[in-house]
Curated annotation (Swiss-Prot):
Protein's UniProt name: 3-dehydroquinate dehydratase
Keyword Amino-acid biosynthesis: yes
Catalytic activity: 3-dehydroquinate = 3-dehydroshikimate + H2O
Known function: Catalyzes a trans-dehydration via an enolate intermediate.
Gene name of the encoded protein: aroQ
Residues bound to substrate: 76, 82, 89, 103-104, 113
Pfam families per the UniProt record, alphabetical: DHquinase_II
PANTHER family for this protein: CATABOLIC 3-DEHYDROQUINASE (PTHR21272:SF3)
Active site positions: 24, 102
Biological source species: Bordetella petrii (strain ATCC BAA-461 / DSM 12804 / CCUG 43448)
């Protein structure tokens, strides 16, 4: 059972609530994180949420997870899902189980968004469920 969950949010997710709400919903990132923190507390696990627009910063945070007691990672790498071998390699290097989450259904989007550099390494993929997808991932992580 995971005791400490790290939730990573990639580029442009800091704009949630105002960025294309028809795709990503009307909740802000702060509201999503607050809901996840509340859920984690109810489940008896720790949760840290972190966001960056910068690929290198995400890689460094993934690497830091190796030393900070993180048992499980939930990641929405956003655009880096489709472009970043560096994020993939960092996740592979730390060998911490992770779930890939996307607010929108990647398979109803442009063809370039339908490829993920992360999915084959992930324990699972949740997409198209909006903020509920993060909650499903937290529930799973808390049990494994």
């Amino acid at each position: 059972m995971a005791q400490q969950i790290l939730v990573l949010h990639g580029p442009n997710l800091n704009l949630l609530g105002s960025r294309e709400p028809h795709l990503y919903g009307s909740l802000t990132l702060a509201q999503i994180n607050q809901g996840l923190e509340t859920l984690a507390a109810q489940l008896g696990v720790g949760l840290t949420a972190w966001q960056s627009n910068h690929e290198g910063a995400l890689v460094e945070r993934i690497q830091a997870a190796r030393q900070d007691g993180t048992d499980f990672i939930i990641i929405n790498a956003a655009a880096y899902t489709h472009t970043s071998v560096a994020v993939r390699d960092a996740l592979a290097a730390v060998a911490i189980p992770f779930i890939e989450v996307h607010l929108s259904n990647l398979y109803k989007r442009e063809p370039f968004r339908q490829h993920s550099y992360l999915s084959d390494l992930a324990v699972g993929l949740v997409c198209g469920l909006g903020a509920d997808g993060y909650e499903a991932a937290v529930r799973y992580a808390a049990r494994h």
